[in-house]
Amino acid sequence: MSEQHSLNPFESGSVTASDVAAAKSGAEDLVNTLTAHTVHPSTELPSATSFPSALPNSENPVIQNISSSSSEPHHTSQSTPGETSSPVCPVSGAHGGADKKCPALEAGCPFTNTTKQNVDPEISNALWSVLTWKNTSCSFSTLMSILALVYVPSWINLPRLFFRTFRYVFLITSIIEFGGLFASNGKRGVLSHFRSSYITCDSKALDRIVNSIVDIFNVMLIQFQRILFAESPILTFTASVAAFIEFFLSGFLSYKSLFVWNVLFAFILPRLYVCNERSIKHLVASLERSGDKLKKQATETINTTVNK
């Protein structure tokens, strides 16, 4: 251990040449230390334990603690709220902000796991009204719009029609504007003064449209899960028959034709069900009674066999 010398100028005692040299060397060491430990605005001032001591860095526990705490940041469950508050994907079980495995990445998974049907009932009623033709004009326009979206792009080259139309529009407007500038000696055009404001998209209206589409998709997704888990066995059996028919049609129909057939079935079968609802319910009730009778007879047969 080297001899320690005080740097306090107000301390009493005799001053020798060795004391002056030691004080000078200590002052130089202090200046070098302060220069090495530059203080940034975002950091705290160094404490007294950060200055040089008699022990080297490898043997000084204070310096070891400081270096370890600066090189290895401490994270706790409270310091990372994004990992706990981010939605968990029910498909992959991953956090949107931590695992980066969901399709929506930081936004989380687009699917939620819930026990309630969080869908506006008006959307379900409106969709059923369209499919059952309660409003004929709305159902007809919806069906024609879907068929037009399927067949019009195959009949008409829409990009070519778009550019062929606007090449004449842009040419005519530029000629008219140049003519107005030429007639007024470059002071005033013709068409450039007609526009009073710019037309932009309303984000709120787009959000409402997207939300309506998502609600319709959720209705179909919920109905598919009800069929899949046999909440209504008759409906599940009907869906299996429809799937068999679709499997048969997919053997010789193209994707477009198969899609059109599905759309037509979606607009025809619900209407047939509504028109024949009483007879269908009577048939279902008779089938249930027959099933109960067969179940009762089978139970009685098993009981008599066991008793013998």
Curated annotation (Swiss-Prot):
Q: Where is this region: Disordered?
A: 1-22, 41-92
Cellular compartments per GO CC: cell division site; cortical endoplasmic reticulum; endoplasmic reticulum tubular network membrane; nuclear membrane
Provide the GO biological process annotations.
cell division; endoplasmic reticulum tubular network membrane organization; endoplasmic reticulum tubular network organization
Keyword check for Transcription regulation, yes or no: no
Q: Which GO terms describe its molecular function?
A: membrane bending activity; sphingolipid binding
Any idea which UniProt keywords this protein has? Cell cycle, Cell division, Endoplasmic reticulum, Glycoprotein, Membrane, Nucleus, Transmembrane, Transmembrane helix
Indicate the segments forming the Reticulon domain, all copies: 127-308
State the Pfam families in the record: Reticulon
Q: How does this protein lie in the membrane?
A: Multi-pass membrane protein
Residue ranges under compositional bias (Low complexity)? 67-81
Where is there biased composition of kind Polar residues? Answer: 1-17, 41-66
Give me the segments passing through the membrane. 138-158, 166-186, 233-253, 255-275
Q: Which residues get glycosylated?
A: 65, 113, 135, 303
Location comes to: Endoplasmic reticulum membrane; Nucleus membrane
Q: Which domain of life is it from?
A: Eukaryota
Keyword Transmembrane helix (UniProt): yes
Self-association or partners: how does it assemble?
Answer: Interacts with TTS1 and YOP1.
Sum up the protein's function in the record's words: Required for the correct positioning of the cellular division plane by delimiting the actomyosin ring assembly at the cell equator. Overexpression causes cell lysis.
Q: Return the protein name.
A: Reticulon-like protein 1
Annotated organism of origin:
Schizosaccharomyces pombe (strain 972 / ATCC 24843)
Its gene is: rtn1
